């Protein structure tokens, strides 16, 4: 009593405490960063290595494997995957959450250094690493276009100037430049001219390499001067290489221009990039795992004017894609939803109390509690994101509950004629323990979430802590500021002016009277209610087992990502046409605002596209509906497939794939993997629960298999090294020399001119100079025939791997897709040598599924323990928890009605319902226990009186929570697909719980009371005997 009086009789101090809480919250709000979701990125490091011209199998065995063995010793690695393709290897290391990315990077560099001696000597550079996840969608894409500069020159500006500067911006993890390659001098050899002049390809390579040398020449000095020696030992342009003498034939000089075309071009001509219908260079910017996307994008945008000034005016630098506008729009929608929730909650209070002064009290308590939470969020290092703001939106209904319970009880005393200050003190004392029990038990629900590990734990931690802090502040405000305001603002009511005798008050009285009559009947037919309660428990179990489930709601971020997969034998020229055709189809869709794409590099049969949709208000379709519409049109394009997926804020794993979810096949027997993967993929593609089924196993590429006749080679004076060198010089885009410039280094690339390699007959024109200086045709000692060969070789750990990717068709859930995959694997009878497991997001979903039931049971157990401690009883907590089954049925039924799968967001709703619906029972049980102990009432009279007197606050608190969540259900703007499952779960659970628990709680209370009496009699009988 003295504690409450301290605040009631000292209004100035109480007001100033509330003002201090508010000011701290305002300051915290201004300092909080903005993000789409809490920081849940796994630390990922990508290692890249290249050996131009090397086959995928060579890259896998000679480059990937040594690196993997060394990298595999690093502590804290969750997963290591690699992909080796023509001339390049990429290894992805995903670390656990506890690894610091910088410390992991140092370990990676040490592992690369340790493996260096095992790598091929012909690698043009050491392996490099980047602290970014290549499977993440870029946070921003910049494009460079020009009518004046070539693609190679644009690429040079992009990689040399722009990418270097952008990479230094805080938060940027990787800047990937695509669409072309660095400028280079290309030497296109004429095999017939070489044969006529008696010049070998090695002669040309040696001559060029020796003619372009950058070596120190020293200095000359006398007694007073010093001269640095400088020579013209470097050749920098094609024009300087053309007159280069590479051989003498019968005393006549053979110049490079006599046997080759020498042009200023690019290192790799098999690259193409486009933005809309125009050739372009793309800068794809990805953030560091721990970086804030909004802050990073803002920093990049702030540097763009400066970057534009560093490049010529004839180059147009544009932002083709930016992830931040949709994130900001989504957060603005949540903030609007929060405001609407506050308004609806206050309206509910006004309808029940019918007093402006009384309504003002919770109208003050709610914003003070919510604003004060921002200070704690800042101290905890949180951000303003969809989940934390959703927590505050839901908290609106919670924080007003405490104030409502106190306010309603004080109002009841005022209506009975008590003086305001006395009513405040008496009313607060009566419900102080009730409010404490409600708040503490509600916070207890979130303790298992705080202890939950992995990505779900990280994801839900901000939500749980934010909501718990809001509830804690609300508890303080409701026991200090609320009674003080009631004592000084409210007046003693007169009988004729009581709100319950007017308007809505009469409706409430009628409802209360009707409830009283129905409750009397229920208390006389408890067995029926008991059967209903048992039925709801069984229905909960059945509905949870059968309801479709997924990991996270499918978001509409306004960005689509597409992967092109063409025939494995397609040429680059044909692939470029496919890219243009696909882009044309997509550009014609009315929902599309911008499209960029690129193809080429080490995988000539694949490409990537990034599509920006129009703002949500400018299109009628969701991102998934746009994909469904485009899927039919894209399927008509022969010889290639374009797989589209909506970019999500959460993507787990480092695998680059053409779909959202992955299933990985592993085997130590590569032949078995290559045999079974097509069978499994074909079977899965026929399943209606999956869409866009594709695989990264590409082992049907066209290969020309040369077989050397070693005896003939020995007789002709030719060794294998010379023959291999011939092939590399001719067809490997071999980098044979380096041109040093102040800003960058460029290569001299040699190959047979593409005009002479249009078909297999090009091999007939190849000659090797033997030990006697004679030109020997390749066909003299080698035979060849076409064969199939892999375009890529993939590993997971040290095992051969193949990842099957898939999307979900409209109406299908991830649980249904998972069941279909497991069923298919069983039906096919896949041997034990081929192991299958889900990967990435699908794997996290499996882990979450296994822990969901345990998490819910842990929350219930935690609440039981807390309530048992508060009530010093084993029985009363069970009475209070008997409200949960009806809420579960309501939540699951609502999800079914809205055709929404059970996701991690819906799980949050279930956890919240555990905390919300027990409040009704707490108010009933508290009053009934007090009536039994202090009012000498029978258990039945006590619980009946408790139900009647607590009817109004129960209705107020339930409707406040329900209306607080209602805006989440009806929201339709950006990010609504993330909010709706939470609102649907809470509204459905509250509605069903309110309907049933008003009757089941008193019945359960009486059941346990009779059970207690029966055991007490048995114990007394035993003692007497």
Swiss-Prot record:
Subunit structure: Part of a tripartite efflux system composed of MdtA, MdtB and MdtC. MdtC forms a heteromultimer with MdtB.
Organism in which the protein naturally occurs: Enterobacter sp. (strain 638)
Primary location recorded for the protein, binned into one broad class: membrane
Gene3D superfamilies (alphabetical): Multidrug efflux transporter AcrB pore domain, Multidrug efflux transporter AcrB pore domain like, Multidrug efflux transporter AcrB TolC docking domain, DN and DC subdomains, Multidrug efflux transporter AcrB transmembrane domain
Origin superkingdom: Bacteria
InterPro entries documented for this protein: AcrB_DN_DC_subdom (IPR027463), Acrflvin-R (IPR001036), Multidrug-R_MdtC (IPR023931)
Pfam families hit by this protein: ACR_tran
Family per similarity comment: Belongs to the resistance-nodulation-cell division (RND) (TC 2.A.6) family. MdtC subfamily.
Keywords: Cell inner membrane, Cell membrane, Membrane, Transmembrane, Transmembrane helix, Transport
Localisation per UniProt entry: Cell inner membrane
Entry's Gene Ontology molecular function annotations: xenobiotic transmembrane transporter activity
Positions of transmembrane segments: 3-23, 333-353, 360-380, 387-407, 431-451, 463-483, 528-548, 853-873, 875-895, 897-917, 953-973, 984-1004
GO CC terms, sorted: plasma membrane
Membrane topology type: Multi-pass membrane protein
Protein name stated in the entry: Multidrug resistance protein MdtC
């Amino acid at each position: 009593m003295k504690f409450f009086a301290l605040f009631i009789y000292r209004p100035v101090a109480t007001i100033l405490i509330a003002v201090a809480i508010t000011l701290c919250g305002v300051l915290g709000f201004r300092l909080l960063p903005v993000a789409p979701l809490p920081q849940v990125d796994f630390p990922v490091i990508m290692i890249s290595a290249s050996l131009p011209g090397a086959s995928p199998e060579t890259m896998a065995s000679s480059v990937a494997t040594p690196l993997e063995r060394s990298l595999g010793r690093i502590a804290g690695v969750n997963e290591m995957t690699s992909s080796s393709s023509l001339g390049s290897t990429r290894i992805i290391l995903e670390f656990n959450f506890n690894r610091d990315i910088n410390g992991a990077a140092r370990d990676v560099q040490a592992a690369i250094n340790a493996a260096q001696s095992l790598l091929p000597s012909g690698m043009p550079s050491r392996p490099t690493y980047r602290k970014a996840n290549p499977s993440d969608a870029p946070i921003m894409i910049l494009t460079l276009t020009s009518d004046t500069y070539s693609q190679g020159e644009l690429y040079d500006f992009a990689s040399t100037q722009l990418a270097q500067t952008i990479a230094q911006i805080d938060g940027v993890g990787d800047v990937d430049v695509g669409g072309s390659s660095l400028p280079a001098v290309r030497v296109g050899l004429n095999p017939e001219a070489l044969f006529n002049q008696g010049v070998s390809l090695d002669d040309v390579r040696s001559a060029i390499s020796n003619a372009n040398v950058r070596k120190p020449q020293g200095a000359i000095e006398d007694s007073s001067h010093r001269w640095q020696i400088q020579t013209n030992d470097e050749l920098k342009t094609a024009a300087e290489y053309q007159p280069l003498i590479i051989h003498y034939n019968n005393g006549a000089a053979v110049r490079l221009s006599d046997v080759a075309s020498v042009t200023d071009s690019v290192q790799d001509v098999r690259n193409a990039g486009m933005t809309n219908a125009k050739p372009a260079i793309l800068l794809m910017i990805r953030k560091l795992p721990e970086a804030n996307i909004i802050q990073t994008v803002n920093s990049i945008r702030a540097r763009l004017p400066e970057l534009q000034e560093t490049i010529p005016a004839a180059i147009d630098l544009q932002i083709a894609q930016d992830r931040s506008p949709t994130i900001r729009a989504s957060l603005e929608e949540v903030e609007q939803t929060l405001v609407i929730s506050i308004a609806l909650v206050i309206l509910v209070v006004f309808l029940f109390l019918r007093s402006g002064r009384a309504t003002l009290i919770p109208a003050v308590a709610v914003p003070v509690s919510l604003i004060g939470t921002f200070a704690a969020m800042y101290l905890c290092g949180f951000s303003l994101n969809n989940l934390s703001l959703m927590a505050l939106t839901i908290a609106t209904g919670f924080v007003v509950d405490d104030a409502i319970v106190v306010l309603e009880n004080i109002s009841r005393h005022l209506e009975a004629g008590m003086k305001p200050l006395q009513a405040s003190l008496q009313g607060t004392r009566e419900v102080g323990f009730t409010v404490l029990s409600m708040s503490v038990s509600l916070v207890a629900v979130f303790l298992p979430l705080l202890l939950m590990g992995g990505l779900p734990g990280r994801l839900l931690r901000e939500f749980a802590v934010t909501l718990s802090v809001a509830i804690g502040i609300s508890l303080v405000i409701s026991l200090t500021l609320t009674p003080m305001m009631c004592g000084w603002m409210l007046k003693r009511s007169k009988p004729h002016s009581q709100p319950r005798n007017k308007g809505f008050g009469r409706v409430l009285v009628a409802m209360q009277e009707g409830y009283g009559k129905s409750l009397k009947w229920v208390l006389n037919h408890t067995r029926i209610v008991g059967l209903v309660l048992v039925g709801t428990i069984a229905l909960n179990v059945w509905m949870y087992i059968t309801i479709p489930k997924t990991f996270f709601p499918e978001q509409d971020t306004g960005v689509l990502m597409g992967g092109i997969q063409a025939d494995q034998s397609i040429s680059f020229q044909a692939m470029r046409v496919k890219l243009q055709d696909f882009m044309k189809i997509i550009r014609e869709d009315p929902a599309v605002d911008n499209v960029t794409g690129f193809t080429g590099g080490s995988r000539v049969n694949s490409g990537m596209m990034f599509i920006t949709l129009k703002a949500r208000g400018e299109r009628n379709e969701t991102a998934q509906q746009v994909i469904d519409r485009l899927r039919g049109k894209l399927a008509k394009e022969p010889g290639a497939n374009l797989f589209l997926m909506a970019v999500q804020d959460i993507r787990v794993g480092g695998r680059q794939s053409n779909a959202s979810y992955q299933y990985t096949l592993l085997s130590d027997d590569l032949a078995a993997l290559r045999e079974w993967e097509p069978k499994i993929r074909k079977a899965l593609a026929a399943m209606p629960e999956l869409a866009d089924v594709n695989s990264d196993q590409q082992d049907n590429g066209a290969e020309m298999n040369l077989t050397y006749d070693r005896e003939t080679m020995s007789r002709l004076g030719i060794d294998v090294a010379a023959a291999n060198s011939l092939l590399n010089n001719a067809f490997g885009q071999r980098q044979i020399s380096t041109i040093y410039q102040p800003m960058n280094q460029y290569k001299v690339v040699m190959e047979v001119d593409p005009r002479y390699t249009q078909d297999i007959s090009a091999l007939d024109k190849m000659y090797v100079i033997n030990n006697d200086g004679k030109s020997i045709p390749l066909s003299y000692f080698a035979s060849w025939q076409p064969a199939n060969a892999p375009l890529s070789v993939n590993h997971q750990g040290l095992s051969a791997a193949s990842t099957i990717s898939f999307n979900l068709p409209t109406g299908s859930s991830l649980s249904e897709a998972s069941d279909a995959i497991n069923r298919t694997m069983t039906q096919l009878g896949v041997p034990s040598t081929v192991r299958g497991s889900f990967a990435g997001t699908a794997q996290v979903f499996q882990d979450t599924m296994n822990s969901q039931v345990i998490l819910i049971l842990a929350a219930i157990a935690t609440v039981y323990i807390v309530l048992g401690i508060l009530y010093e009883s084993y029985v009363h907590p069970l009475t209070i928890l008997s409200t949960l089954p009806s809420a579960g049925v309501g939540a699951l039924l609502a999800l079914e009605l809205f055709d929404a799968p059970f996701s991690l967001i819906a799980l949050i709703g279930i956890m919240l319902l555990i905390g919300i619906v027990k409040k009704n029972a707490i108010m009933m049980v508290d009053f009934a226990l007090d009536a039994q102990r202090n009012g000498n009432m029978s258990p039945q009279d006590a619980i009946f009186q408790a139900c009647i007197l607590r009817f109004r606050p129960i209705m107020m608190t339930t409707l406040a929570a329900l209306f607080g969540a209602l805006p989440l259900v009806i929201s339709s703007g950006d990010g609504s697909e993330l909010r709706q499952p939470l609102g649907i779960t809470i509204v459905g659970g509250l509605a069903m719980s309110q309907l049933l628990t008003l009757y089941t709680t008193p019945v359960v209370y009486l059941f346990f009371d009779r059970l207690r009496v029966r055991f007490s009699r048995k114990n007394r009988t035993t003692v007497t005997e």
